[in-house]
Amino acid sequence: MSVVQNDDMDELAEIHSVNMVTFDFFDHVDHQQKTPSDRADDLNFSWSSIAENIGYVPWFENVSGCGDTRSAEAISECVVEGWRNSPGHYANMIGNFSELGVGVAFTQDSLAYFTQVFRIP
């Protein structure tokens, strides 16, 4: 099964990334104690399965294991490589999901918070 990008899923992921920056937390459970499935329900998204990966990477010239992350491509590659090297995150990436959304938000000190959300409607 191939995974396709979905604008609604991008919105779901973006909201979570922005909330992690705005409310200063890093977790799948947000500042209102809502899980990824709760947040999908709040936006009236149908789903039979949903999963989420989160990560953060600094926008910096010398990030351990990544090198210079001061471009959209480099910082994205860095977070994806981190997910690929984590069994739980990688399981989400290769799971039987049909849709994907991605969101990113930056802190004032140039730390990028990424959210990747997968679903089967």
What are these regions (language model features)?
Residues 1-43, 96-101, 105-107:
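Short, well-ordered surface patches within globular domains
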Residues 36-120:
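A well-ordered secondary-structure block
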Residues 9, 120-121:
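Mature exported/compartmentalized surface modules and terminal targeting/interaction regions
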